[in-house]
UniProtKB/Swiss-Prot annotation:
Pfam families: SpoU_methylase, SpoU_sub_bind_like. The gene is aviRb. One of its GO terms (biological process) is rRNA methylation. Its EC number is 2.1.1.208. S-adenosyl-L-methionine binds at residues 210-211, 232, 252-254. Belongs to the class IV-like SAM-binding methyltransferase superfamily. RNA methyltransferase TsnR/AvirB family. This is 23S rRNA (uridine(2479)-2'-O)-methyltransferase. Keywords: Antibiotic resistance, Methyltransferase, S-adenosyl-L-methionine, Transferase. It comes from Streptomyces viridochromogenes. Homodimer.
């Protein structure tokens, strides 16, 4: 939230030791349960923090280096974002920054949104991605980044999975986490209730799974229709439950000796084909 003109910036607190507050923030880096209980996670970097603010994510606390001259961006951030501000010793910030070569200038403590499928907008041109039981938070972040870049409307992370708000996922998304709704859902049933409700409301979403023995090649499928693309676990692929629920399955033609693509790369390739079809107006033949 930006301050109104003339409103004074609250005096910042200082933390120079590994006190209880610091330990709470440190736990957000590596403890999923504590992130979930606290309902918050850490964000660092100019673009991710700027996008979090731009898209209205509540920033609970801004931690900044109290012993260096801050950049113009950091000064403006501290001036305009109305929240708790704490000056930190640089060695403490470095620990929160996962001990990179240099401490981050600013770390934001950001509130998690509710895991509500209604956060994902559904229109007649709907294009969404479901990632089934991913084990790599980096892959989650990479798919969020690709889905955002290619105009998808949201990501569903299904089943027992890595955490959307793991630091590796947040970092891999390069800020796209804050512009693309990403929702964690425990079971296929909850997703299908949402899909069926959208179908009943007039948006005939089709579920398209990925499989090396798909019904057709990705280039021959009609992605101009409302589509939820299902990407399987990095090792096991789609679960039997999701395979059964698919309306169609598609495969990516492979050359050379590679047998498959990384899950994030596969999602990106298929999303690109979907967008290409939609831009060109091409309608392929759905089996």
């Amino acid at each position: 939230m930006a301050r109104s003109r003339g409103e004074r910036t609250p005096a910042a607190r200082r933390i120079t030791s590994r006190n209880a507050r610091f330990q709470q923030w440190q736990a957000l880096l590596g403890n999923r349960n504590k992130r979930t209980r606290a309902g918050e996670f850490l964000v660092m970097g100019v673009r991710p923090i700027s996008l979090a603010v731009e898209h209205g994510w509540p920033v609970r606390t801004l931690l900044y280096d109290g012993q260096r001259e801050l950049s113009k961006w950091a000064r403006e951030l501290l001036r305009t974002v109305r929240t708790e501000q704490i000056a930190m010793a640089p060695d403490l910030l470095m620990e929160l920054g996962e001990k990179n070569e240099a401490p981050p200038e600013v770390v934001a403590v950001v509130e998690m949104p509710a895991d509500d499928l209604d956060r994902i907008p559904v229109r007649e041109d709907f294009l969404g991605v479901l990632f089934d039981r991913p084990t790599s938070p980096g892959n989650i972040g990479s798919i969020i980044r690709s889905a955002d870049a290619l105009g998808a409307h949201g990501l569903i992370v299904a089943g027992h999975a890595a955490d959307v708000y793991d630091p590796k996922s947040v970092r891999s998304s390069t800020g796209s986490l804050f512009s693309l709704p990403a929702v964690r859902v425990p079971s296929p049933g909850e997703v299908m209730d949402w899909v069926e409700a959208r179908r009943a409301a007039g948006t005939p979403i089709v579920l398209v799974g990925t499989d090396e023995h798909g019904d057709c090649d990705v280039f021959d499928f009609d992605f101009t229709q409302p589509t939820l693309l299902l990407i399987g676990n990095e090792t096991a692929g789609l679960s039997n439950a999701w395979r059964t629920l698919c309306d169609y399955t598609v495969s990516i033609p492979m050359a050379g000796s590679a047998s498959s693509l990384n899950a994030a790369n596969a999602a990106t390739a298929i999303l690109y084909e979907a967008v290409r079809q939609r831009i060109s107006g091409r309608t392929a033949t759905t089996p």
